[in-house]
């Protein structure tokens, strides 16, 4: 048996690559450099890697020529290179949308009769179709809302945080189920769901804030019953969907015996630092829960003076650190943006 060792070193703006081949030898009991394999010892299963398909991604994709589209899709979802096998898609608009929008903004439409999937069909599905064709099979989708429709919120706006009004909690649960069904009725594999992107953050873009108790009530009394009524309980629900350093506190306060069987995992972001110990604590305290990084990107405002390769090193650092502590998968943010890091409702950031 042979071991191939690949090393890429970046130092003083110089890239050096090495490849070494080592022959395995029988273990003769000597104290030496050795690789021990213990088949009975297992760690976490790796669910896979992927990225987000937002309206911004779809808009840029629509402006590319066919050759550019094929090259991009092949690099991400082909079998030889990055091998992406998951995607994250926003429910309604997010910060990386062409404009604010809602599938149904009619406050009087209690039965969602005016629900429109046209924006998803225009911007999201062409990218998803190309990805699945390249991948060779259906790609598991994680859906995440940034905000309920404006009329359902106390501040009557999609942005600037605000809270979901209790009287609309049931309707918001039905709205989420409708989104899932729109995808599934077209044959797409919605497999994962988070209840709210960054539930502690009051953002100048689409956002909505919850406490752990509020989210627990929403899940237990509204969302899960709605999923059950629509035969959608096979979907994996992920808690949190925010930065790593507060993940354990949120899960500890929210998770109890009443909702334990409703929850499959915890979704985390990377924007506040490494916090690899937070991943380890989650895995130690809740070993049955999966841990996915659901969003990560390099923000221009923080890293504008470093090279592209240095940014790649940040990804490698985060991936290795998280996987070593028990992470099950990684979803990058936008897989494609324009040269200005958009389109975006407020600011820009680079895509991989």
Predicted segments with their positions:
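N-terminal catalytic cores of secreted or lumenal carbohydrate-active enzymes
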Residues: 19-190
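Structural recognition of the beta-strand scaffold that forms the well-ordered cores
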Residues: 48-53, 85-90, 140-143, 191-195, ...
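Active-site beta-loop-alpha junctions enriched in small/polar residues
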Residues: 54-56, 92-94, 146-148, 195-200, ...
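Short acidic/His/Gly/Ser-rich catalytic and metal-binding motifs that mark active-site loops
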Residues: 96-100, 149-156, 200-204, 247-249, ...
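Active-site-proximal loop/short-helix segments
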Residues: 146-158, 191-215
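Active-site neighborhood of glycoside hydrolase catalytic domains
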Residues: 185-186, 206-299
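Catalytic-core region of carbohydrate-active enzymes that cleave or remodel glycosidic bonds
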Residues: 268-340
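Conserved small/polar residues in nucleotide/adenosyl-binding loops
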Residues: 347-352
């Amino acid at each position: 048996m042979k071991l191939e060792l690949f090393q890429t070193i970046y130092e003083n703006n110089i890239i050096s690559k090495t490849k070494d081949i080592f022959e395995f030898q029988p273990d003769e009991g000597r104290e030496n450099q050795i690789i021990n394999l213990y088949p009975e010892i297992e760690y976490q299963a790796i669910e896979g890697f992927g990225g987000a398909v937002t309206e911004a991604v779809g808009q840029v994709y629509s402006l590319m020529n066919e050759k550019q589209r094929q090259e991009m899709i092949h690099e991400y979802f082909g079998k030889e290179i990055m091998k992406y096998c998951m995607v994250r898609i926003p429910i309604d608009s997010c910060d990386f949308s062409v404009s604010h929008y809602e599938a149904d903004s009619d406050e009087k439409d209690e039965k969602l009769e005016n629900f429109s999937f046209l924006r998803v069909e225009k911007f999201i599905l062409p990218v998803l179709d190309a990805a699945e064709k390249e991948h060779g099979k259906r790609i598991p989708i994680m859906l995440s809302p940034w905000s309920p429709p404006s009329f359902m919120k106390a501040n009557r706006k999609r942005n600037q945080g605000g809270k979901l009004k209790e009287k609309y909690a049931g309707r918001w649960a039905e709205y989420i189920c409708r989104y899932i069904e729109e995808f599934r009725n077209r044959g797409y594999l919605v497999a994962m769901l988070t209840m709210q992107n960054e539930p502690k953050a009051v953002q100048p873009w689409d956002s909505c804030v919850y406490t752990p108790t509020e989210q627990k009530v929403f899940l237990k009394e509204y969302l899960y019953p709605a999923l059950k009524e629509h035969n959608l309980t096979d979907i994996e629900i992920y808690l949190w969907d925010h930065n790593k350093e507060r993940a354990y506190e949120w899960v500890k306060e929210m998770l109890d015996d009443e909702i334990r069987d409703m929850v499959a995992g915890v979704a985390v972001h990377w924007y506040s630092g490494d916090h690899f110990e937070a991943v380890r604590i989650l895995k130690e305290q809740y070993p049955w829960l999966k841990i996915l990084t659901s969003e990560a990107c390099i923000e221009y405002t923080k890293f504008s003076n470093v090279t592209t390769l240095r940014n790649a090193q940040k990804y490698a650092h985060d991936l290795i650190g998280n996987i070593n502590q028990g992470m099950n998968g990684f979803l990058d943010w936008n897989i494609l943006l324009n040269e200005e890091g958009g389109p975006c409702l407020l600011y820009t950031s680079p895509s991989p």
